[in-house]
Amino acid sequence: MIPPEIRRSVLLQKAIKLALAGTLLTFASFSATAADPSSDTETPQPPDILLGPLFNDVQNAKLFPDQKTFADAIPNSDPLMILADYRMQRNQSGFDLRHFVDVNFTLPKAGEKYVPPAGQSLREHIDGLWPVLTRSTKNVEKWDSLLPLPESYVVPGGRFREIYYWDSYFTMLGLAESGHWDKVADMVANFGYEIDAWGYIPNGNRTYYLSRSQPPFFAFMVELLVQHEGDDALKEYLPQLQKEYAYWMEGVETLQPGQQNQRVVKLEDGSVLNRYWDDRDTPRPESWVEDIATAKSNPSRPATEIYRDLRSAAASGWDFSSRWMDNPQQLSTIRTTTIVPVDLNALLYQLEKTLARASAAAGDRAKASQYDALANARQKAIEMHLWNNKEGWYADYDLQNNKIRDQLTAAALFPLYVNAAAKDRAAKVAAAAQAHLLQPGGLATTSVKSGQQWDAPNGWAPLQWVAAEGLQNYGQDDVAMEVTWRFLTNVQHTYDREKKLVEKYDVSSTGTGGGGGEYPLQDGFGWSNGVTLKMLDLICPQEKPCDSVPSTRPASLSATPTKTPSAATQ
């Protein structure tokens, strides 16, 4: 390594020019969107752009078992200087790439394994985890990929060392249930800050997540805060709700029937719906090698198209699932951007309803009426285009083939969750979910076994909550109880054996963590903790709360959802 004290200015300038030239040359093969790292002083650059060929070489060398490790590494000095050093040294005899990385970067520390005190109940274990999972960005380094936030926040756990958008809502449910309303308020404030900073909420607070968002749960977060602070929370966050809506609807005013623009689509009949989209079409920095391998496995498709669809699936939160693929056994057939997801549009319906309510709270009746009209139009579009009449369930719309898709997934419960479903259709969805998705350990994500983590036999805490509350909204209490009871039993049995909660569960039985996907099973785990606490308080009466799952199934759920039903349910 060249000592810093002998880096004379002329030599450094020459090296930097060479480094930048190498960066641009390397990334021309991935996407025309790659840019000079110094060209944008406003938006922080992700590590694949900041470090160019060095990042590519480190990831391709597979120096670390998890590709996210180097994506999260912090440069110890100006990345341009590190890149200049690298280009000057890499072809020298005896050059050691791992040593170079160790000298020039601070790698993320492996989190200390949390060992709970002996004899803790499930509730006690979760309550003890909140401080363990709480993080702050007060000391973020200059070139860190971590994006600073003004308040502390709760992370999922494991390899996920940052805040994630849709995860956080389900974590916040548990924080509220534990009485940590201060943490709930802090996390809502953080997301409001991100909307003000970027115009939207990124996938997570990392530079490499800035090109996409995630399922839009901010409206639900604000509605949760209303339970503690009243309508003042609606008025406080109305500007941020409006900005997030503008992000999702950007470009709608110029669309003609049959056209799409980023996240918004206009169908042939003029109906406006949304899809997931990532602004970049390169490999994901946190899964670099895997994405390149996926693209290479299907040379008949442009690599950039595959990269965009992989990234857009990450934006959906369902990364990955047969839901997005033509061939469930071949990830390279993914085409997320040609699919209109039923869950996304249900969530945007909720955002429109919350905007109407917030506008009314702020005294703007005209705006409230406008948002109500937008919500009603979306609800009609959901009923018209996202209902599979032949199968009897809500499903995604296929833009490529101009028809409704047949696959039943747990996303079919989202219209029930936001009270956007007609009563007769809600009953059909409940019957379908009970017949095809309900398993001994909870609700399966799909009925397809693809080896991907958002497929059978995995069940995920947020989807259990959405299903249980959605079913309750429409009086399907028995099915809601079965989902709740079976999933809680699964969580309890796993905790009894392993003394931890995990990211996902195998619902084909009880007591087993889930598998599949790009990385090992993670424990912690934010949204599992939050949903478990909420469900514990659903199955046990308020006057006699339970700290662990009872050994026998209760006769009924003790609480009901607090959301006001929309006109669709009347």
UniProtKB/Swiss-Prot annotation:
UniProt catalytic activity: alpha,alpha-trehalose + H2O = alpha-D-glucose + beta-D-glucose
Alphabetical list of SUPFAM superfamilies matching this protein: Six-hairpin glycosidases
Annotated signal peptide: 1-34
UniProt keywords, alphabetically: Glycosidase, Hydrolase, Periplasm, Signal
GO cellular component: periplasmic space
GO biological process per UniProt: cellular hyperosmotic response; trehalose catabolic process
Compositional bias ranges of the Low complexity kind: 554-570
EC number annotated for this UniProt entry: 3.2.1.28
Active site as annotated: 319 (proton donor/acceptor), 503 (proton donor/acceptor)
Enzyme class: hydrolase
Binding sites annotated in the UniProt record for substrate: 159, 166-167, 203, 212-214, 284-286, 317, 518
Molecular function in Gene Ontology: alpha,alpha-trehalase activity
Keyword Signal among UniProt keywords: yes
Keyword Translocase assigned: no
Region (Disordered): 544-570
PANTHER family membership: TREHALASE
Subunit field text: Monomer.
Family of the protein in this entry: Belongs to the glycosyl hydrolase 37 family.
Function noted in UniProt: Provides the cells with the ability to utilize trehalose at high osmolarity by splitting it into glucose molecules that can subsequently be taken up by the phosphotransferase-mediated uptake system.
This protein's name: Putative periplasmic trehalase
Species this chain originates from: Salmonella typhi
